[in-house]
A protein has these predicted regions:
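Bacterial N-terminal signal peptides
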Residues: 1-6
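Sec/Tat signal peptide C-region and signal peptidase I cleavage site
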Residues: 9-13
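Conserved beta-alpha junction segments in alpha/beta enzyme cores
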Residues: 14-128, 134-260
Length: 260
């Protein structure tokens, strides 16, 4: 049984506006490799690789979240940067959500500093879904324990894409109405905490934005779950459960080619 608690915000419709935007931030894969011993770790002495660009070195996208040396082999689905801008006529805030493991404070500050003042944003939140199936964006999951897996060129692109997504959301601002929902999950939902103190937040929180005619503009969903369902042997870039949630909310869930 699903219980939903809904509150509707009393904001003057002509003043309250919201805008959404999204764009892919999937890294480009260059070299190819074969995991000979199936340990999901690249070892030049054991595994085979192809120097696609002919530069004499293994150009890897090092995947974050589990062991070191986990080099991506393919792309299952796109990683996304999703932005929402909320403006109540007095304050304008921007939220950027990205399918990354995490983002360092220095990087987030640089994103904020590069956003033009003319855009009128009072606050910008840059959020990572904590995706364990994307590139290393924090320097902890490179080719060895003491070597970073961060690609500087990708990080520069990431910052530009964040700002572009934010601008698109501003351009998409439109009159909106807002409602809030708190959804307790089924006790069988597989959320675990293996480290003390055991703290589990099993509620789903949602903010829905509608046009005055009732049609949906977009939503914000918060659910405390590790984005790591593909687990540590996966070598394909994917947005994992966060991507499935976004696509399911936006387009519905299909099973055996049927919308359920």
């Amino acid at each position: 049984m699903l219980f939903v608690i809904i509150l509707t915000a009393q904001v003057h419709a002509s003043e309250f506006k919201v805008g959404f935007a999204k764009m892919p931030i999937t890294p480009n894969l260059i070299d190819e490799w074969e995991d000979i011993n199936n340990d999901a770790q690249f070892d030049a002495d054991i595994d085979k690789w192809t120097d696609i660009n002919g530069n004499g070195r293994f150009d890897a996208v090092w995947m974050a979240g589990f062991q070191n040396k986990r080099a991506a082999q393919g792309i299952k689905d796109d990683l996304m940067s999703v932005a929402v801008v909320i403006d109540d006529g007095q304050t304008r805030i921007g939220i950027i959500s990205a399918d990354t493991i995490g983002l360092m404070r220095k990087f987030v500050l640089s994103v904020r500093e590069d956003v033009p003042v003319e855009w009128g944003l009072d606050y910008i939140m840059v959020h990572a879904t904590h995706n364990h199936e994307g590139p290393d964006t924090q320097g902890l999951w490179g080719p060895s324990f003491l070597r970073s897996g961060v690609n500087d060129a990708y990080m520069k692109r990431l910052k530009k894409d964040f700002i572009r997504t934010l601008k698109m959301a501003i351009d998409n601002l439109e009159t909106a109405e807002m409602s809030l929902a708190l959804i307790p999950t089924n006790p069988l939902t597989p959320i675990k905490d293996k480290r003390k103190p055991i703290v589990i937040d099993d509620d789903i929180r949602a903010i829905l934005f509608n046009r005055p005619d009732g049609s949906i503009i977009g939503s914000l969903i918060n659910f405390g779950i590790h984005v790591e369902l593909a687990w540590d042997k996966n070598l394909d870039i994917t947005s994992d459960v966060a991507g499935y949630l976004r696509r399911g909310i936006s387009h519905g869930i299909y099973y055996d080619d049927k919308l359920i």
